[in-house]
């Protein structure tokens, strides 16, 4: 009886994951037997399932360890899971009209999104290297198929192949790093690895293990120098799937990196008063990502490739907070990723809303004179672009404020200064789009917006515009989540 009670208590901890897994199996059956309208039926039920899972996490918070620390359920994991679920939910909402018009409205699409989301939830709660890899691969395999799901489109097929090949390489790097750490410590748990290494001189093999693990994880957030897949996949994949790639997987991967760093690497003492190896790697990736995001996007005219480089830059700014290695830094990342998700949803809703009678907008110069033909869209996107450029009092400004403040508090003043300079440079290409929309001569008018696009645009614009008034609410929850990670 006692054992049964303990098993039930353990299963309650992962109830959201169980709900998603059961939902996937049920939706597969529904999709097969619902005939011609299977796509809309399954998509609607998937959106309802994601919303129900968010409600479950919010109303019934549970803390604990599942199966000897394989999964860790705490305030941090709940916060990041909610963000991930919101990202998946809005991606599906945005996909409805696009999928129908582009003739790939197949019921497997929302189910693959659910499979990827389940993998992300496992990643976020990972407590050891085994659960880390299982969650990561469940997410990755679903994402490879999603990238190439538009089989009649050459660019989509090319994006899927590129993502698969480079993703397999990153998985190999990650596995090799895990094997090195396991070989030198005999442990797979994050905290156990830290305990085994702490106080001892780090062997060269351990340092290589740390490097390979961080390299494999950096691929998932498109951090330089593991960003090569991002522009091509963003451009080639269908736009709603690009919106999904830009949001939920980045949040889950960042959560995983945070947990690995905080549990396994931060407790390690650096020798000879020198900066720890993990911190050197993070600083290099942060500066490189911020620099590439600032300079590479300047020459881009394809709007999805531009958003790809923008995303790389944003991950660099988030890594600034992680390099600080303290509670304030993790809190800054949580706030940054919250704001980043809001801006991403709004930006891709705009891209999906900008459609001519025969095609979607691909070039930023197609937006010329938008304020004259569609003032609502011009105003909403201007708000988003000001936020992406981190111009106060928009939400994007506060995201960078928290991460740079954490870096300064940790003594990484040069890193914060470099970040601020690159942020100013990166604002150029956002302001260029505003100039095109407001001051260039108008082109052809666009088709009427669908209701789901209007909903996403309005919610996102209100979020980034009025964050200054209710941001303290997110700050409070982010602080609780960050604190739970260091306990």
Swiss-Prot record:
Key word Protein biosynthesis present: no
Catalytic function, reaction form: a quinone + NADH + 5 H(+)(in) = a quinol + NAD(+) + 4 H(+)(out)
Organism name: Bartonella bacilliformis (strain ATCC 35685 / KC583 / Herrer 020/F12,63)
Record keyword Cell inner membrane present: yes
Highest taxon of source: Bacteria
Position of the signal peptide: none
Listed NCBIfam families: NDH_I_N, PRK05777.1-3
Regions that span the bilayer: 12-32, 40-60, 79-99, 104-124, 129-149, 164-184, 201-221, 248-268, 281-301, 310-330, 332-352, 378-398, 411-431, 455-475
Function: NDH-1 shuttles electrons from NADH, via FMN and iron-sulfur (Fe-S) centers, to quinones in the respiratory chain. The immediate electron acceptor for the enzyme in this species is believed to be ubiquinone. Couples the redox reaction to proton translocation (for every two electrons transferred, four hydrogen ions are translocated across the cytoplasmic membrane), and thus conserves the redox energy in a proton gradient.
GO-annotated molecular function: NADH dehydrogenase (ubiquinone) activity; NADH:ubiquinone reductase (non-electrogenic) activity; quinone binding
Annotated InterPro entries: NADH-Q_OxRdtase_suN/2 (IPR010096), ND/Mrp_TM (IPR001750)
HAMAP family assigned to the protein according to its UniProt record, in alphabetical order: NDH1_NuoN_1
BP GO terms, sorted: ATP synthesis coupled electron transport
GO cellular component: plasma membrane
Protein name as it appears in the record: NADH-quinone oxidoreductase subunit N
Membrane topology term: Multi-pass membrane protein
Quaternary state and interactors: NDH-1 is composed of 14 different subunits. Subunits NuoA, H, J, K, L, M, N constitute the membrane sector of the complex.
Pfam family membership, one: Proton_antipo_M
Keywords linked to the UniProt accession: Cell inner membrane, Cell membrane, Membrane, NAD, Quinone, Translocase, Transmembrane, Transmembrane helix, Transport, Ubiquinone
Similarity comment text for this entry: Belongs to the complex I subunit 2 family.
EC numbers, comma separated: 7.1.1.-
Localization annotation: Cell inner membrane
């Amino acid at each position: 009886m006692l054992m049964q009670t303990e098993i039930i208590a353990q299963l309650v901890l992962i109830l959201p994951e169980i709900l998603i897994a059961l939902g996937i199996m049920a939706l597969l059956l529904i999709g097969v037997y619902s005939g011609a309208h299977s796509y809309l039926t399954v998509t609607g039920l998937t959106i309802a399932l994601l919303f129900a899972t968010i409600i479950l996490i919010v109303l019934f918070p549970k803390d604990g360890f599942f199966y000897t620390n394989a999964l860790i359920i705490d305030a941090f994991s709940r916060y990041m899971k909610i963000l991930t679920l919101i990202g998946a939910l809005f991606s599906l909402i945005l996909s409805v009209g696009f999928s129908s018009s582009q003739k790939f409205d197949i019921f497997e699409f929302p189910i693959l999104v659910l499979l990827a989301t389940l993998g992300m939830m496992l990643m976020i709660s990972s407590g050891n290297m085994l659960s880390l890899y299982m969650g990561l691969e469940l997410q990755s395999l679903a994402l490879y198929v999603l990238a190439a799901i538009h089989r009649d489109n050459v660019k989509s097929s090319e994006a899927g192949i590129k993502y698969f090949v480079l993703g397999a390489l990153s998985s190999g790097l990650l596995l090799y790093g895990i094997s090195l750490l396991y070989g030198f410590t005999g442990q797979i748990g994050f905290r156990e690895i830290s305990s085994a290494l702490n106080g001892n001189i780090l062997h060269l093999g351990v340092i290589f293990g740390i490097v390979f693990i961080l390299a494999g994880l950096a691929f998932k957030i498109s951090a330089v120098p593991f960003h090569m897949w991002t522009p091509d996949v963003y451009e080639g994949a269908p736009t709603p799937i690009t919106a999904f790639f830009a949001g939920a997987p980045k949040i889950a991967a960042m959560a995983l990196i945070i947990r690995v760093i905080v549990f396994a690497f931060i407790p390690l003492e650096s020798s000879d008063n020198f900066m720890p190896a993990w911190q050197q790697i993070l600083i290099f990736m942060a500066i490189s990502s911020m620099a590439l995001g600032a300079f590479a996007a300047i020459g881009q005219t394809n709007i999805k490739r531009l958003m790809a480089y923008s995303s790389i830059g944003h991950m660099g700014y988030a890594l600034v907070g992680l390099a600080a290695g303290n509670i304030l830094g993790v809190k800054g990342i949580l706030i940054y990723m919250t704001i980043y998700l809001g801006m991403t949803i709004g930006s891709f809703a705009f891209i999906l809303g900008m459609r001519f009678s025969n095609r979607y907008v691909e070039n930023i110069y197609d937006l010329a004179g938008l304020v004259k033909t569609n003032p609502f869209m011009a105003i909403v996107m201007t708000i988003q672009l000001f936020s992406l450029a981190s111009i106060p009092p928009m939400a994007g400004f506060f995201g960078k404020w928290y991460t740079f403040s954490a870096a300064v508090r940790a003594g990484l003043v040069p890193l914060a200064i470099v970040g601020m300079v690159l942020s100013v440079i990166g604002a150029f290409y956002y302001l260029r789009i505003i100039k095109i929309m407001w001051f260039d001569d108008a082109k052809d008018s666009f088709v009427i917006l669908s209701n789901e696009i209007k909903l996403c645009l309005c919610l996102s614009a209100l979020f980034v515009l009025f964050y200054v008034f209710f941001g303290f609410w997110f700050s409070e929850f982010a602080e609780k989540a960050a604190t739970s990670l260091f306990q």
